[in-house]
Amino acid sequence: MKKKKRSPLFRRLNYFSPIEHHSNKHSQTTREDRDWENVYRNRWQYDKVVRSTHGVNCTGSCSWNIYVKNGIVTWEGQNLNYPSTGPDMPDFEPRGCPRGASFSWYIYSPLRVKYPYVRGVLINLWREALQTHQNPLEAWKSIVENPEKAKSYKQARGKGGFVRAEWPEVLKLISASLLYTVMKYGPDRNVGFSPIPAMSMISHASGSRFMSLIGGPMLSFYDWYADLPPASPQIWGDQTDVPESSDWYNSGYIITWGSNVPLTRTPDAHFLAEARYKGAKVISISPDFAESSKFADDWLSIRQGTDGALAMAMGHVILQEFYVNQETERFIEYAKQYTDFPFLVTLSKENGVYTAGRFLHAKDIGRKTKHDQWKPAVWDEQTSSFAIPQGTMGSRWDGQQKWNLHMIDEETGEPIEPRLSVLGIEDEIGTVRIPYFSNDGNKVLERDLPIKKMNLNGEETYITTVFDLILANYGVNRGIGERSAVSYDDPEPFTPAWQEQMTGIKKEAVVKIAREFAQNAIDTDGRSMIIVGAGINHWFNSDTIYRAVLNLVLLVGAQGVNGGGWAHYVGQEKLRPAEGWQTIATAKDWEGVPKLQNGTSFFYFATDQWRYEDQPISDLASPIAASSRYKHHADYNVLAARLGWLPSYPTFNQNGIDLYKEAEKAGAATPEDVGAYVASQLQEKKLKFAIEDPDNEVNFPRNLFVWRANLISSSGKGHEYFLKHLLGTTNGLMNDDSDSIRPEEIKWREQAPEGKLDLLINLDFRMAGTALYSDIVLPAATWYEKHDLSSTDMHPFIHPFAPAISAPWESKSDWDIFKALSKAVSDLAEEVDMEPVKEVVATPLLHDTMQELAQPFGKINDWSKGECEAIPGKTMPNIQVVERDYKHIFHKMTALGPNVALKPSGTKGMSWSIADEYESLKQRLGEITSDSVAKGCPNISEAKQAAEAILTLSSTSNGKVAVKAWESLENITNLKLKDLAEEREEECFTFEQITAQPKTVITSPAFTGSEKGGRRYSPFTTNVEKLIPWRTLTGRQSYYVDHELMMEFGETMATFKPILQHRPFLSKRPDQEGKEIVLNYLTPHNKWSVHSMYFDSLPMLTLFRGGPTVWMNKDDAEDTDIKDNDWIECFNRNGVVVARAVLSHRIPKGMAFMHHAQDRHINVPGTKLTNNRGGTHNSPTRIHVKPTQMIGGYAQLSYGFNYYGPTGNQRDLNVVIRKLKEVDWLED
């Protein structure tokens, strides 16, 4: 019989009953009701568990179990069935963090975007226009070509006023804008931005595929985020390849340099702790006492931005003690085979003093060989003459199968012994000029250098080796003259005593750690590691900092060794199933010519930040150079676009479709004819690049899609410039361009445009900053509501996303949204009877193609100045022709096109057939049966089908493809390599398999390490062990980069460059109110969010101050009467932030931290400086583009999407901080 439930009143009367005690009153009998336990049981009950992950660019890519009850996600928990790492190694689990554990809050939060929304002003204009114009394109034209109408909805951005709309209506509006733009201005005025595909590959590929099919450019992100380390392409010819976090455990000595591992790599931090338990020594280099400092045996509190000085001094010690005072055999042999130390460099002589020039090549020494301008020479000790070693860039492309690191002369086939130095065979000890940079003015150092004289081609030629130049550069005392440091106490650049003045670190500590780092490499055979990160990568001169740091791992032979080398972790960059993803994301299966634009250049011009440059580029140039080519940064970008170094979309001041018609009318019958026509029009200045007049309305970007990103409030460096010039809405910019530097190559328009974009379309599941400024917001599915894939460099697995619940309300997955949009575009093209078109497309000179041999010797020849002929694909961009039929966009979007079978697949210069895999996908995915252009193709209409296709077509997830890939590389190198993948040749990952349990990827030449036999992944191990060259000019790791522009800026070798000198205001500034202080403004990663994600979630907001904060040193705050938790204004001419002050002794004096991506929709009051709310963390920022990062068409310095290009750095700036006099929430 069921017990009758008593009322709460009677239950309370139990407290008056006597209590029965036992065991000397150590226990008692109670009669309380235990029904409350059911609440707990119900809370943790569930109907099903689904494996998924988080797509948030945290680099974690952790596997999570999602628990569902009655169709509601109730909680998530860490998955525990990762494959074992093997004996004597810690396992990967547990992986996760409190941020990820709180994600399910978003699904049902007030921030959830549940329906499509359109700005009210815009939707009313659209509805009225449709009543007047039957043709939707004419309806859209009547809005955007009417200045008053366009201004009315653009000025409403960021000010609310959204109304709910129906999917068909919204899709038609977007489609009309897209097709109108295609016909009026050109397809390249429709732009897409979505970052970090590895964090959710299918979602990224959905929009990228759509943009590629309609001819719109995709913007890069890795460089724009300043996550890209440009030094990696410069040194290795590789974007970024780093060890998985488990490889830290193999290390014997670890330096964390600008990387706060416990905070930013939370799921992986246990490996660092475990390595230390095992006996590894850990050094922390950080200005503040960061979380990573608590792991350390030694903490070097460095002055921010001076890391390059410390690294140069450490390099000085290692070179002095382990190369000169006593030659370390392992280091010497490593340097000869795997670095460019023995390669010969030419010298020019003027007034008895020498200057380093370019490499000596086969052409210079009279060797008759293919690509003789791309084969640098060494001095062979065995023959006492020149030799051309195998493995150079020229041998990569000459078809002779000699692209390997065997120490053999490629012409004679004889073994060689490269000489590291010409000292001992020199003809002279001369004086070489070395550029030196400081805030007190750049100057020239004179150093002693051994020099050999040779008569080549009838001319006296002076040569030395890279090794000799490096020793001179570091000021190492070789006993050959008096122009070097006498001891470590000598304040000459770059000694330990010199760096102490720069960094504040005692010279004794520098000597000690440099010795330990090198000695550990000797004792452990190279297991010395440096973990680097955003702390040193977000500066203007991050590449010179990194080169100085990375020289250390090269000097001790640590690179290419498990437990050694560099470990750069900024951004979830490693997309492991690369070839399959690339095929689908760029629509190579159909079109084959994607437009891949570097993001930094795009935003620099689109937001008009180029108009506000105030520091002449000549201040940054080498004191050895006669002068800088230009005074304005933007001029170098124009040069880069003109010479084919960088992409530039929009490309021309003319619609690419109309340009093709003109070329055809002029008699062009082939793509080559079209290229010649375009080149002639450019030379005659009848046609111009759009970048030469970016403020002309015909050159504006018109439609911008943003998905999987919070561009406006997270990554939009120069936030207020975005609001003013790109969006045309209320902004907090306190800068003007009246006294800025004027460019030479760009037309200056006195009135800067405001509101360039016609539409900003955002796909998101939460109403974040970008959504609040968008014209249209489309409701996206969360990570627990769709099929997708994720991978990272931190572990070797590919993780799935899976729908624990169906996408609620009217939300859709990104794949389904772009699929629906492609249908709408095709339907509208049918409705207006849009004919197929042909478009002229310009693409840059690409890395890993023959185009990286386009411009020999690193010499700049500008056809626009008459220095050479304009030749497409050689001295200017490639010119191609692409046909598009907008009626077929939907059919192509949802089918895997025939090019997969007809054309080779590949990556990094390799290629192979995947026709068999294409046929197997027809069987597994089904074929398209509709009577369309896609009939008979594999069906990828669903996201899961697209994921299966990616896994099947990629060498890291399909063993047969991996073997084909290695065979392709064997054909180039004449090495035996496919054994790296043969043991797993029969494996082919499926979505169901990786859902059941994570699988370690297959070893592939798409990357440079090996997972064979359960090995922990470490980069460049296949280069070292298998003798595969690096993809650089010499085929080796580069200490010396000899491009003319690198010489202009004094960066042929690693050096120290101080941070830019920035003043918060120039001629005009707001009135001073009370006490103020000027501080260096840094925006490191946040403890309570991952970028802007989780910042606005209730669980994370409750853990700290519940809104935006700025961290200050307590003494700096005391000087300005600021107390902890006071409201402050943090501002300069770029914008203003209003936040609470967090005072801490862990922050050094002279700097302020504002953790990045604190969105402005949570607890942000107003400021009288702008009479508006405070801005985002990026309001005080403005980007600075660096010319040396624009180089292209030259070996490893050639363009690749997210591979090389100027970074969106933002740290070289200062702000004024003062107490906010009155907190005004602007609610009246």
Swiss-Prot record:
<dbReference type="GO" id="GO:0016020">
    <property type="term" value="C:membrane"/>
</dbReference>
<keyword id="KW-0479">Metal-binding</keyword>
<dbReference type="InterPro" id="IPR006468">
    <property type="entry name" value="NarG"/>
</dbReference>
<keyword id="KW-0411">Iron-sulfur</keyword>
<dbReference type="GO" id="GO:0043546">
    <property type="term" value="F:molybdopterin cofactor binding"/>
</dbReference>
<keyword id="KW-0500">Molybdenum</keyword>
<keyword id="KW-0004">4Fe-4S</keyword>
<dbReference type="InterPro" id="IPR028189">
    <property type="entry name" value="Nitr_red_alph_N"/>
</dbReference>
<dbReference type="GO" id="GO:0005886">
    <property type="term" value="C:plasma membrane"/>
</dbReference>
<dbReference type="InterPro" id="IPR050123">
    <property type="entry name" value="Prok_molybdopt-oxidoreductase"/>
</dbReference>
<keyword id="KW-0560">Oxidoreductase</keyword>
<feature type="binding site">
    <location>
        <position position="62"/>
    </location>
    <ligand>
        <name>[4Fe-4S] cluster</name>
    </ligand>
</feature>
<dbReference type="InterPro" id="IPR006656">
    <property type="entry name" value="Mopterin_OxRdtase"/>
</dbReference>
<dbReference type="Pfam" id="PF01568">
    <property type="entry name" value="Molydop_binding"/>
</dbReference>
<dbReference type="InterPro" id="IPR009010">
    <property type="entry name" value="Asp_de-COase-like_dom_sf"/>
</dbReference>
<dbReference type="GO" id="GO:0160182">
    <property type="term" value="F:nitrate reductase (quinone) activity"/>
</dbReference>
<keyword id="KW-0408">Iron</keyword>
<keyword id="KW-0249">Electron transport</keyword>
<comment type="function">
    <text>The alpha chain is the actual site of nitrate reduction.</text>
</comment>
<dbReference type="InterPro" id="IPR044906">
    <property type="entry name" value="Nitr_red_alph_N_sf"/>
</dbReference>
<dbReference type="InterPro" id="IPR037943">
    <property type="entry name" value="MopB_CT_Nitrate-R-NarG-like"/>
</dbReference>
<comment type="similarity">
    <text>Belongs to the prokaryotic molybdopterin-containing oxidoreductase family.</text>
</comment>
<dbReference type="GO" id="GO:0042128">
    <property type="term" value="P:nitrate assimilation"/>
</dbReference>
<keyword id="KW-0534">Nitrate assimilation</keyword>
<dbReference type="InterPro" id="IPR027467">
    <property type="entry name" value="MopterinOxRdtase_cofactor_BS"/>
</dbReference>
<dbReference type="GO" id="GO:0051539">
    <property type="term" value="F:4 iron, 4 sulfur cluster binding"/>
</dbReference>
<feature type="domain" description="4Fe-4S Mo/W bis-MGD-type">
    <location>
        <begin position="47"/>
        <end position="111"/>
    </location>
</feature>
<protein>
    <recommendedName>
        <fullName>Nitrate reductase alpha chain</fullName>
        <ecNumber>1.7.5.1</ecNumber>
    </recommendedName>
</protein>
<dbReference type="InterPro" id="IPR006655">
    <property type="entry name" value="Mopterin_OxRdtase_prok_CS"/>
</dbReference>
<dbReference type="GO" id="GO:0046872">
    <property type="term" value="F:metal ion binding"/>
</dbReference>
<dbReference type="InterPro" id="IPR006963">
    <property type="entry name" value="Mopterin_OxRdtase_4Fe-4S_dom"/>
</dbReference>
<dbReference type="InterPro" id="IPR006657">
    <property type="entry name" value="MoPterin_dinucl-bd_dom"/>
</dbReference>
<feature type="binding site">
    <location>
        <position position="97"/>
    </location>
    <ligand>
        <name>[4Fe-4S] cluster</name>
    </ligand>
</feature>
<dbReference type="GO" id="GO:0009325">
    <property type="term" value="C:nitrate reductase complex"/>
</dbReference>
<keyword id="KW-1003">Cell membrane</keyword>
<feature type="binding site">
    <location>
        <position position="227"/>
    </location>
    <ligand>
        <name>Mo-bis(molybdopterin guanine dinucleotide)</name>
    </ligand>
</feature>
<feature type="binding site">
    <location>
        <position position="58"/>
    </location>
    <ligand>
        <name>[4Fe-4S] cluster</name>
    </ligand>
</feature>
<dbReference type="Pfam" id="PF00384">
    <property type="entry name" value="Molybdopterin"/>
</dbReference>
<keyword id="KW-0472">Membrane</keyword>
<dbReference type="Pfam" id="PF14710">
    <property type="entry name" value="Nitr_red_alph_N"/>
</dbReference>
<feature type="binding site">
    <location>
        <position position="54"/>
    </location>
    <ligand>
        <name>[4Fe-4S] cluster</name>
    </ligand>
</feature>
<keyword id="KW-0813">Transport</keyword>
